[in-house]
Amino acid sequence: ITNTALNNGVKGYSRLEACNKGNVITLSDTIGGSPVFYQEKDFIGFAHLKMLIPKKNTLPDFDGLVGRYIAVSIRKSISGRYNYTTKLNTGNILRTKISLPCKDGLVDTDFIRKIMTEEQKRSAGLVLDYLRSFSEQ
């Protein structure tokens, strides 16, 4: 995983053993744009790649749906604020604020999963409609 803002940060694949655990959010402190992604699988990370690792006591049921939701929330929060000159360094990462749905003072992961599942279904429907438009021609 590199600091690119493309392809979920994936630069390539290796047969070497992964040195970073998956189920984390990665971001870069060296480029502009919004290179914030959820990484499901263990990976090898390049220099300047930062990882946000969920705390088990705060988000015990952190998974891909919750991770992608939080990554998008971070991406929206930092959009347009950082570039090659103004870096998204550790201090700026720690000061970044995002809004998450809460219930009883905790992040409402059930609600997040519901929203993300509905969005996946909607997106899949759009892709199917698009593909069907070709078969009807």
What residue spans do the PLM features occupy?
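Charged, alpha-helix-forming regions
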Residues: 2-137
